[in-house]
Amino acid sequence: MGVRGFFAITRPANSVVAGLAAIVAYLIATGTLVYGVLLLMAVVLLVTAAGNVINDYFDAAIDTINRPDRPIPSGAVSRNAALAWAFSLFLLGLAVSVFTTPLCMGIALVNALLLVLYAARLKSTPFFGNAAVAFLSASIFLFGGAYAGWHALLDMLPIAAITFLAMLARELLKDAEDIEGDRAHGADTLAIRIGVRKTALIAFACTAFAIAASAVPYLWWGGWYLAGIAAVDLVILFAAGRSLGCTDPVSLKATGSTTLLKLGMFASLVVFTLSAVFL
């Protein structure tokens, strides 16, 4: 076992991006940046890294078949060492959160527990696993707002709701695209239980609610925001709409819906950030 294996199992690129997202979340919540956002970045980076490690710990048997190059099945990190490493990172992340705010500490603790629960149980639970991933993504915005206080946290609720619903839609469609592979490996997903068509319909409903929620920030950002987000909403609605009527994963993949949704979500982040800074 070497340092490289312990570094790789944290999926550093993924963890750093999550940490940077916390900085963006604070910027959206307040329109400004302070040195304290580096603490937010550190907490999210460490907790995300811990979540990645604990996920590999529980997926060790599956990765032996599907991803033998991952640190645990390749022998770079033992399973017991990975467990100890995961909880060390969790504890370090929670320790850093002590220097933020009580609200941030609470969110960090909830997310740490949810990451363990997701890896151990929820990942293989239809819909609830998807919802957990969506919540973890959306909670970064709550985390950024929480650092600025209750008022900023409440202002971020619509942004978090939009992110949760759009991410949930994408996660459901991704499962529908992977239905054959998941079925072959004995996985249990919502798409396997109800089929591609109904899954796409639920995903479309999620995006419709996300679009409805995207109108709320107009109350404090005004008309320029509404014009920008309306353009993005059209992309997201188009992306989800293309999936309607698909009855199999091949036709669903051909629509490019998940890719378009990802682009739409990134564009919405740009609109939120520009609105927070300039409006």
UniProtKB/Swiss-Prot annotation:
Tree of life domain: Archaea
Transmembrane portions of the chain: 5-25, 27-47, 90-110, 127-147, 148-168, 198-218, 219-239, 259-279
GO molecular function, one term: geranylgeranylglycerol-phosphate geranylgeranyltransferase activity
Enzyme class per UniProt: transferase
Membrane topology, as annotated: Multi-pass membrane protein
Pfam family, one: UbiA
Stated name of the protein: Digeranylgeranylglyceryl phosphate synthase
Species this chain originates from: Methanoregula boonei (strain DSM 21154 / JCM 14090 / 6A8)
